[in-house]
């Protein structure tokens, strides 16, 4: 938005300094290394799932889907799952699980993480997750709202269904409903007796910033004021091409839709821990 405004003003010879701040919890803006609020959204999404997953303690063969915001980028889904598993490990170390009440780490753990940057192999994953269901009587999946969208849209069109789009021409994800689709498909393949889909989107993005985000916000806000007073336009944030320096990134370099790097070490480590094969790279951030 700031880049569009700056371009419009320049076109009409209007001398005005424009300084923007990157505020998207998807964390998908080039060349911003970390956008404001994304850490908080991941932490709050983890808290959200920590509460709703307790439903599976009272249901046999429970399939629980956590749909996380992220149209084109899986960073938030990855980070939310990572935060959630960190909470689980902390609970385990303090002896807070109650096996006799179906409150076990295995039952509450993340069993699959699906992001837009990699393809979902339903057949292979169903075989793997069926074994998880048989062992724990529960399967929990974290999925980005944009994961597998193309395949779902293709199937909708084959059935003759209309695919509504928003003002920008993007498919309306609330109508495509990735979480419901995955829940229905895996529910049948895993023999689930109860399927529940939860969306943490508004809960996570409406939260007050955590301490880590507050520090980043303060640094960026101070730099933004400095840039404005110095007559320097741009979007202020940690520039991933300048060793993370907080600076006014030039407007021509600003672009949304930066994909999550599925070869990121911590992501691959998490998938290994939960028994999910590492995805083949479709695309990575540059």
PLM segments and residue spans:
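Accessory alpha-helical/coil subdomains and C-terminal extensions
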Residues: 1-15, 19, 35-193
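Short, ordered loop/turn segments at secondary-structure junctions
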Residues: 21-27, 118-119, 145-148, 200-203, ...
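Gly-rich Lys/Arg/Thr-decorated short loops/hinges at beta-loop-alpha junctions or inter-strand turns
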Residues: 23-33, 60-61
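Generic secondary-structure boundary/loop-capping signal
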Residues: 26, 33-35, 66, 110-112, ...
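A broad, low-specificity signal for short, low-complexity segments enriched in glycine/proline
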Residues: 26-28, 99-105, 196-198, 224
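Short beta-strand elements at the ligand-binding edges of bilobed clamshell
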Residues: 31-41, 208-214
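C-terminal non-catalytic interaction/assembly regions of soluble proteins
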Residues: 152-286
């Amino acid at each position: 938005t700031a880049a569009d405004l700056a371009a419009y003003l320049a076109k009409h010879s209007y001398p005005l300094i424009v300084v923007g701040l990157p505020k998207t919890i998807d964390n998908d803006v080039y060349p911003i290394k970390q956008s404001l609020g994304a850490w908080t959204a991941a932490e709050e999404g983890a808290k959200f799932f920590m509460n709703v997953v307790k439903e599976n303690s009272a249901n046999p063969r429970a399939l629980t889907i956590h749909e996380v915001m992220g149209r084109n980028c899986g960073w938030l889904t990855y980070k939310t799952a990572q935060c959630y598993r960190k909470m689980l490990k902390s609970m385990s170390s303090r002896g807070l699980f109650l096996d006799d009440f179906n409150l076990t780490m295995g039952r509450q753990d993340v069993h699959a993480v699906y992001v837009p940057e990699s393809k979902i192999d339903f057949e292979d994953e169903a075989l793997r997750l069926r074994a998880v269901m048989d062992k724990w009587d529960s399967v929990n999946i974290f999925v980005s709202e944009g994961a597998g969208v193309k395949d779902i849209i293709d199937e909708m069109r084959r059935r003759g269904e209309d695919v509504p789009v928003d003002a920008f021409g993007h498919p309306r994800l609330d109508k495509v409903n990735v979480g419901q689709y995955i829940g229905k498909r895996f529910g049948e393949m895993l023999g689930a007796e109860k399927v529940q889909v939860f969306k943490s989107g508004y809960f996570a993005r409406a939260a007050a910033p955590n301490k880590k985000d507050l520090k980043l916000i303060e640094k960026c806000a101070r730099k933004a004021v400095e840039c404005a007073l110095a007559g320097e336009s741009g979007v202020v944030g940690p520039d991933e091409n300048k060793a993370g320096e907080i600076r006014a990134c030039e407007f021509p370099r600003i672009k949304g839709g930066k994909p999550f790097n599925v070869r990121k070490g911590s992501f691959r480590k998490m998938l290994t821990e939960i028994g999910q094969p590492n995805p083949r790279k479709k695309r990575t951030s540059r």
